[in-house]
Amino acid sequence: MVIHIEGSNYVQSAILPHYIQATHKEDLLFDLDLNYLFNLGIVTFERVLGLIETLNQQEQQQQNNIAIVVQKQQETTFTILK
């Protein structure tokens, strides 16, 4: 499962900043491998989507356009170790 995120620098820097390498392009696109983060127990898919939705709403209030595409590439079972 991969989440493709396009948006402003604000959105990019706010989403899991320790796990995303930023580029210098104006329109940023990241492929975030959730398997790694899920297996570490750092995030859940719902929390990631919730954070993206919250940031998306904040961006829309500021008249900035943002496109979020969640692409499910394959059936994946996540085991969160605690």
UniProtKB/Swiss-Prot annotation:
Superkingdom, taxonomy of origin: Eukaryota
Record's protein name: Putative uncharacterized protein DDB_G0284929
Record organism: Dictyostelium discoideum (Social amoeba)
Taxonomic lineage: Eukaryota, Amoebozoa, Evosea, Eumycetozoa, Dictyostelia
